[in-house]
């Protein structure tokens, strides 16, 4: 593993770096799954959010907002863009949907031999994204006491765009509740 995985359900999912609790999964919970490994010495990082049974309508709405924010950022990502400008693509969309204050972290980070490397893709930085770098695109919305949603993929930055290194589905998967 390239880092300790995060498996955070229900209200614990509203904590971006949640730690395990003894709270059992409940029908309607969203579960944030953040995990990664190493391949040939290089780290990986991916996050998906799944539902246990049928989530509340607000959770489905937030999921689709995060998914669209990520889609827009993936489309805009390319070498030569600044980290702040790329972060702004997702952050602006989330803000327009009324959840700006609930997107509390930067959009992503570099990944290489270590899980968190330069550049930091954030509203706090103004670095130019270099060709050949691998960065994460991971917008999230976190509603304290309720749930969180984060969707993360790694991309290879190129002068004319970004190549997604993930092929897994981003559809909201509903796992049957026990």
For the regions a protein language model found, what residue spans apply to each?
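Active-site neighborhoods and metal-handling regions in enzymes and metal-associated proteins
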Residues: 1-178
């Amino acid at each position: 593993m390239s880092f300790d995985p995060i498996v955070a359900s229900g209200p614990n999912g509203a904590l971006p770096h949640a730690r395990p609790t003894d709270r059992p999964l409940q029908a309607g919970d969203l579960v944030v799954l953040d995990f990664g490994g190493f391949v040939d010495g290089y780290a990986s990082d991916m996050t998906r959010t799944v539902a246990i049974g049928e989530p509340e309508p607000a959770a489905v709405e937030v999921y689709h907002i995060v998914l669209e924010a990520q889609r827009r950022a993936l489309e805009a990502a390319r070498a030569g863009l600044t980290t702040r400008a790329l972060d702004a693509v997702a952050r602006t969309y989330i803000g327009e949907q009324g959840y700006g204050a609930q997107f509390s972290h930067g959009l992503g980070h570099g990944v290489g031999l270590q899980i968190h490397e330069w550049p930091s893709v954030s509203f706090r930085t103004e670095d130019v994204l270099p060709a050949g770098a691998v960065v994460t695109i991971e917008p999230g919305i976190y509603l304290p006491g309720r749930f969180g949603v984060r969707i993360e993929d790694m991309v290879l930055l190129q002068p004319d765009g970004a190549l997604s290194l993930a092929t897994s589905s981003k559809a909201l998967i509903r796992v049957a509740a026990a």
